Amino acid sequence: MAEHDYHEDYGFSSFNDSSQEEHQDFLQFSKVFLPCMYLVVFVCGLVGNSLVLVISIFYHKLQSLTDVFLVNLPLADLVFVCTLPFWAYAGIHEWVFGQVMCKSLLGIYTINFYTSMLILTCITVDRFIVVVKATKAYNQQAKRMTWGKVTSLLIWVISLLVSLPQIIYGNVFNLDKLICGYHDEAISTVVLATQMTLGFFLPLLTMIVCYSVIIKTLLHAGGFQKHRSLKIIFLVMAVFLLTQMPFNLMKFIRSTHWEYYAMTSFHYTIMVTEAIAYLRACLNPVLYAFVSLKFRKNFWKLVKDIGCLPYLGVSHQWKSSEDNSKTFSASHNVEATSMFQL
């Protein structure tokens, strides 16, 4: 959903011909760039998250708390990316889907955005408990599974509640073309504060605190798996910062310095960083599922079952993967059955 749409026709009407020409160039660029990025994220996110869901449901039983979260995360991302074709069409043309669809898609878009970010936070906390409090976590696996299901349900409820402003105040406005959004400064401020708190600062602070302790714990541990785990942690942190920080920084600047709306370059920056931020829906399956040896084994089972690839030495690959993971599984029995092993 283009963040600049709500105000794209404000702050330019009184400018000279040069500024108007720059703004028209920006509008033409936005009609090409953002819809194309939306469609790329949609296709990649649809394929990746669908694969994770299919494998999680049909090839792997929910045997750990991490598995519970790894079902909810791709579900949220999948529904999220399914709203993008509508915004892509609206970016090229205008909003033609009516007021009910406007409110519905704003709600779906926002609910699944919050759900995805909150689940990422829970996955981080779960990793902390598994690595730092391994014995306690192992002895309370059944209780943790129950707690995980309750937490997942609570996350969806919280996401619905904090999305109510968009659902209630979302409407179709005619600003030279029909636009779906919420054109109210007070609502925009509330939405921005909520998005930055739940969608950026909470996951970021949780990652910093939990991963700092996890890294310290792993550095005192032995074995080859330590180095792989540290690489995964740094990769997760780097991807989160690179995709989410630029867009959130731009939104923060926009909320405190409204004069930037008069700068076409600022609109370009908002648009590009927004597209980068949405890449998380494509990268989450790679970061949180495909890094798992067990998940990759189940993926090849799926490929074999649907006949996409001939069965050529796959069993040897599975065996090799399982043998390579025995050392880690023996020392970290808590999540030995989980698809994701940190």
From Swiss-Prot:
Glycosylation sites: 16
The protein's name: C-X-C chemokine receptor type 6
Residues spanning the membrane: 33-59, 69-89, 104-125, 144-164, 188-215, 232-259, 276-293
Gene designation: CXCR6
Lineage per the UniProt record: Eukaryota, Metazoa, Chordata, Craniata, Vertebrata
Gene Ontology terms: cellular component: external side of plasma membrane; plasma membrane
Tissue specificity: Expressed in lymphoid tissues and activated T cells.
Superkingdom, natural source: Eukaryota
Source species of the chain: Homo sapiens (Human)
Keywords: Cell membrane, Disulfide bond, G-protein coupled receptor, Glycoprotein, Membrane, Receptor, Transducer, Transmembrane, Transmembrane helix
Function text: Receptor for the C-X-C chemokine CXCL16. Used as a coreceptor by SIVs and by strains of HIV-2 and m-tropic HIV-1.
